[in-house]
Amino acid sequence: MADKILRAKRKQFINSVSIGTINGLLDELLEKRVLNQEEMDKIKLANITAMDKARDLCDHVSKKGPQASQIFITYICNEDCYLAGILELQSAPSAETFVATEDSKGGHPSSSETKEEQNKEDGTFPGLTGTLKFCPLEKAQKLWKENPSEIYPIMNTTTRTRLALIICNTEFQHLSPRVGAQVDLREMKLLLEDLGYTVKVKENLTALEMVKEVKEFAACPEHKTSDSTFLVFMSHGIQEGICGTTYSNEVSDILKVDTIFQMMNTLKCPSLKDKPKVIIIQACRGEKQGVVLLKDSVRDSEEDFLTDAIFEDDGIKKAHIEKDFIAFCSSTPDNVSWRHPVRGSLFIESLIKHMKEYAWSCDLEDIFRKVRFSFEQPEFRLQMPTADRVTLTKRFYLFPGH
């Protein structure tokens, strides 16, 4: 019986499952009515670590009997073949499976298929309700075998301790509130958790408080057993940097982007040496609209490009100290970024949508290129996301589900 199998595999499941698979299981079990909304919320909110969530989830389902347990097992076999291999599970058709799905003649589609169809029917925004596509084990192995020296290695899910930091400022003493930013915060946190990161969230900080949080994050011992990290900053911004909550024309409460790089570089954060460090910034970088009226001829002076800044004496040294970074900003320098009061930021929405859709098959820089392409012919306001200070030396595949 499936419930007995699940109990027998309990310890292995707790030690091996990723947070992405846990979240997928919760969605599947809610959809199949194995769990109700209250049970799902309790598992998510009452447990801090992924292992605690896994333990609570496994115990909940096994107590509900063989039918519920079979749905649990079938999902793992279909959506996380790597975990299924570790647990030695098989999703062979059985009477138990069909009892749970008899109200659908064609059988239930996967949770991702169901959600995609639901999005088309109810008009919800893609990217907010989409599902992260997992990378099949065969695809991950193929990518790795083809170019092992050109891809950043990932650590085993059972031992790695990935961390991510989100700083989101929504309320300010002298600036307007960032209406809709809570959507960005919620969706970005869920995405990073699905990708296997434990997410630290900090809200409404001054520049000094942001510096303190980044320094503490850089010093976290978990980075030693992690293969990468994400830092996400969402706030008002100006050309000089990211606004703290007390910023005004009289109070220069600004976190410079350069300061973030300095706090996370090899000298200050040696635990992340040779590991990808991704910085996402949703903030204006000026007050310009990011659009010009085109004319048939434009004079470009060669001198405009041959500035001293390109030929810094210590460039080689910086490349070694500041390595394996990529920053993705919501707009080009000097220009504004746009935010919808219901949907959230256009940049964050597009980024999450493309990460969910393509992370299983594309490296991060390719995903960022797809995000930029989505802004090439804008439907609403004009802005163009840009990658800054890219020192990645290899391709960074996220391999969702692994």
From Swiss-Prot:
**PTM section of the record:** The two subunits are derived from the precursor sequence by an autocatalytic mechanism.
Q: What is this protein called?
A: Caspase-1
The UniProt annotation puts the region (Disordered) at: 98-125
Where the record annotates domain CARD, the positions are 1-91
Kindly list the residues the record flags as site (Cleavage).
D103, S104, D122, G123
Task: Tell me the GO molecular function terms.
Answer: cysteine-type endopeptidase activity; peptidase activity
Function in brief:
Thiol protease involved in a variety of inflammatory processes by proteolytically cleaving other proteins, such as the precursors of the inflammatory cytokines interleukin-1 beta (IL1B) and interleukin 18 (IL18) as well as the pyroptosis inducer Gasdermin-D (GSDMD), into active mature peptides.
The entry's localization annotation reads: Cytoplasm; Cell membrane
This protein's species is Mus musculus
Concerning SMART domains, the annotation shows:
CARD, CASc
Which of the residues bear the PTM Omega-N-methylarginine?
R343
Q: What is its EC number?
A: 3.4.22.36
Q: How does it assemble?
A: Heterotetramer that consists of two anti-parallel arranged heterodimers, each one formed by a 20 kDa (Caspase-1 subunit p20) and a 10 kDa (Caspase-1 subunit p10) subunit. May be a component of the inflammasome, a protein complex which also includes PYCARD, CARD8 and NLRP2 and whose function would be the activation of pro-inflammatory caspases. Component of the AIM2 PANoptosome complex, a multiprotein complex that drives inflammatory cell death (PANoptosis). Both the p10 and p20 subunits interact with MEFV. Interacts with CARD17P/INCA and CARD18.
Q: Where is the signal peptide?
A: none
Reaction catalysed? Strict requirement for an Asp residue at position P1 and has a preferred cleavage sequence of Tyr-Val-Ala-Asp-|-
